[in-house]
C-alpha cells in the first residue's frame, strides 16, 4: 500500500458547530489516532453560534480554544457575519469546516474564506438541497441518497462538490433511521476529505474540485 502524502506542515482547521459535534469528534479522533503530521491537519479552534452545546464541550475536553458568535448579539445579520469572519480569522485557518453549523454565512465571511469553507449535506447534491434533504429524498421516493461534502458558496448547498457517499433507501426507513445511516457515512467521508485536502492540496476549476 502506498504511503499517504505528508503535507509540508499541518494545515490549520477552525471547526464551526451548532449542536452535538459528532463530526468534530470524528475529526479529533482521527487526528489523535493518525497523528497531526500524517493526517495533515490540526484543529486549532472551535466556534459556535450558541452557548452550551455539546460540540463546544467536546472541544474544551480536548483542550482547544473555543468562541461563540451569536446572531442576536449583533444589530444586523451582516454585522454578525463580519464578526464571525473576524473570530475565525484570528486563528489563521487554512480550512474552515462546518461540522453541523446551522447558520448561513454571508458575503464578508465568503470574501475571506470562499474556496476554503467545507460543509456537509445529507443528500446527493444537487438533489434535495436545503434543511430537509433526508425528508425530501424519502418523500420523492428516491431509492438511493447519501451525503455530499462541498465547498460553500453564496447559495444554499450549491457550492462545488468535493466528494459524495451513497446510502441505500430501505422500504422500512423513516426520516430518523435513514438520517442515522447517512450520518455514519458522512462522518467517515468528512474525515477522509479534510485529510486529503490538507495533505494533497486542491484546486477549483469552475464547479470541479480537483484534489492534487
Predicted features and spans:
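N-terminal glycine-rich "phosphate-gripper" loop used for MgATP/nucleotide binding
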Residues: 48-50, 72-73, 77, 91-107
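N-terminal Rossmann-like dinucleotide-binding module
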Residues: 2-54
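Short, well-structured alpha-helical segments in soluble
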Residues: 82-91
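Donor/substrate-binding cores of folate-linked one-carbon enzymes
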Residues: 99-208
Amino acid at each position: 500500500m502506498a504511503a499517504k502524502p505528508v503535507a509540508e506542515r499541518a494545515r490549520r482547521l477552525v471547526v464551526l458547530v451548532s449542536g452535538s459535534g459528532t463530526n468534530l469528534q470524528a475529526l479529533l479522533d482521527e487526528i489523535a489516532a493518525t497523528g497531526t503530521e500524517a493526517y495533515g491537519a490540526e484543529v486549532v479552534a472551535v466556534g459556535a453560534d450558541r452557548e452550551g452545546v455539546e460540540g463546544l464541550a467536546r472541544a474544551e475536553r480536548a483542550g482547544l480554544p473555543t468562541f461563540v458568535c451569536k446572531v442576536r448579539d449583533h444589530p444586523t445579520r451582516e454585522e454578525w457575519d463580519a464578526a464571525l469572519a473576524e473570530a475565525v480569522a484570528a486563528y489563521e485557518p487554512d480550512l474552515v469546516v462546518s461540522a453541523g453549523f446551522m447558520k448561513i454565512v454571508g458575503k464578508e465571511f465568503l470574501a475571506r474564506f470562499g474556496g476554503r469553507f467545507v460543509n456537509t449535506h445529507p443528500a446527493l447534491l444537487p438533489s434535495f438541497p436545503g434543511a430537509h434533504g433526508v425528508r425530501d429524498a424519502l418523500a420523492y421516493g428516491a431509492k438511493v441518497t447519501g451525503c455530499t461534502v462541498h465547498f460553500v458558496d453564496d447559495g444554499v448547498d450549491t457550492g462545488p462538490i468535493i466528494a459524495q457517499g451513497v446510502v441505500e433507501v430501505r422500504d422500512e426507513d423513516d426520516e430518523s433511521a435513514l438520517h442515522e445511516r447517512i450520518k455514519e457515512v458522512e462522518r467517515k467521508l468528512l474525515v477522509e476529505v479534510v485529510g486529503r485536502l490538507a495533505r494533497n492540496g486542491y484546486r477549483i476549476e469552475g464547479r470541479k474540485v480537483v484534489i492534487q
